[in-house]
């Protein structure tokens, strides 16, 4: 695949959890271009988190094709794919386990075998990218919820990912940290797929929205068009973003 090709390409993706008769995902087709910020929205249980887990090999697809930077999703390609794709969990605490912020951010680059001087340089750069360089020597437990989210992102940025996946990144953030996160995400060069119930956050962060309903893609297009279509959102059991609600 050439450099101009999609970072992520999936076609006719299906997944059903063991013991269930109705698939969570039924024929999902989606591609993401380099640098594109895409919001993944839909009601509870529609398969947003499941889809993210399929993209990093936590779950295995049962039908369809999936490629990341031209690499097919196969066991032998998993290590290479995970180096290209960062995954931010909803609970940032699950990704932060070292004694200081700098140690946590450096962990991924160390784990991939970069020499110490390059690990240090990548760590400094990543901390600066998310504006928490002043927290480098701080114990993780002293960070706010927003700072923990940024530390998780910084750790992934040390590997220069082509794509970052995020599951409910604005959850539990106060307004200031929420605005800060939006600004930082909009300034990053990599592609993103952001799953969220917070449609205002998606509107501010993403240029494109993919709407899931009953395991399928119900709509895929510019954020401004989809997130202002009250009839479409209502058919998928969603409400308009707060900024577009009247009364």
Where are these regions (language model features)?
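Helix-to-loop junction immediately C-terminal to a conserved catalytic motif
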Residues: 56
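Conserved ABC transporter NBD signature motif
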Residues: 64-72, 81
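Conserved ABC ATPase "signature" region
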Residues: 117-135
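Conserved ABC ATPase signature
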Residues: 139-143, 147
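H-loop/switch region of ABC-family ATPase nucleotide-binding domains
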Residues: 196-197
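A short, surface-exposed alpha-helical micro-motif characterized by mixed small hydrophobic
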Residues: 202-204
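Conserved beta-strand-loop-alpha-helix hinge in the C-terminal portion
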Residues: 216-239
């Amino acid at each position: 695949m050439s450099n101009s090709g999609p970072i992520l390409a999936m076609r006719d993706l299906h997944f059903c959890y063991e013991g269930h008769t109705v698939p969570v995902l039924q024929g999902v087709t989606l591609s993401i271009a380099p640098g594109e910020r895409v919001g993944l929205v839909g009601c509870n249980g529609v398969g947003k988190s499941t889809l993210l887990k399929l993209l990093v090999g936590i779950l295995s697809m049962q039908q369809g094709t999936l490629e990341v930077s031209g690499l097919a999703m196969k066991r032998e390609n998993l290590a290479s794919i995970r180096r290209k794709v960062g995954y931010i969990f909803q609970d940032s605490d699950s990704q932060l386990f070292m004694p200081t912020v700098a140690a946590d951010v450096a962990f991924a680059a160390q784990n991939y075998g970069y020499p110490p001087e390059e690990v240090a340089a990548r760590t400094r750069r990543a901390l600066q990218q998310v504006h928490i360089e002043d927290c480098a020597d701080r114990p993780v437990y002293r960070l706010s919820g927003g700072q923990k989210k940024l530390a998780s992102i910084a750790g992934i940025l040390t590997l220069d990912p082509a794509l970052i996946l995020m599951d409910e990144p604005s959850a539990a953030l106060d307004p200031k940290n929420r605005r800060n996160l939006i600004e930082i995400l909009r300034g990053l060069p990599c592609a993103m797929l952001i799953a969220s119930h917070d449609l205002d956050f998606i509107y501010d962060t993403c240029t494109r929205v993919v709407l899931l309903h009953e395991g399928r893609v119900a709509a895929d297009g510019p954020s401004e068009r989809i997130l202002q279509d009250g009839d479409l959102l209502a058919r998928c059991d969603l409400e308009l973003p707060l900024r577009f609600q009247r009364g």
